[in-house]
């Protein structure tokens, strides 16, 4: 079952779903919009392939600021301004807001697992021309779905509780 605006407001009021900070215009007809945070990680142009066991920091450049340009065909990691917490019976689908999608920006299919909490780090793929995006701009739309029963194994992975843009983590 997809949660509509009335459902979402109720879940937020009961604190079953947490979105912090929550702005008045964030709750939409069938989801919640998330805003651009103040940090981005750009993929470095390196001449060697990444292999598990290598330090992912060697492949990214982090930037902090209030506006970012996503260059043509560039892939970046962006973080949401909001911290999200989901219960064990709610998951979310992440989509690019249509205004940015119409500019050619893309996000890969992404799911937020039931039980997740943290700021979202999302890959954004650039368009055919540069696009400037400012901190605080609504850029993602989350569609929330209720599972029939609470999940047996809620998310407790390595990205649980993440804050700021989080580059890939590999464990042995």
UniProtKB/Swiss-Prot annotation:
GO terms for molecular function: dCTP deaminase activity; nucleotide binding. Its EC number is 3.5.4.13. Keywords: Hydrolase, Nucleotide metabolism, Nucleotide-binding. Pathway: Pyrimidine metabolism; dUMP biosynthesis; dUMP from dCTP (dUTP route): step 1/2. The active site is at residue 123. It comes from the Archaea. One of its GO terms (biological process) is dUMP biosynthetic process. DCTP binds at residues 97-102, 113, 155, 162. Signal peptide: none annotated. It catalyses: dCTP + H2O + H(+) = dUTP + NH4(+). Catalyzes the deamination of dCTP to dUTP. Homotrimer. Belongs to the dCTP deaminase family. This is dCTP deaminase. It comes from Metallosphaera sedula (strain ATCC 51363 / DSM 5348 / JCM 9185 / NBRC 15509 / TH2).
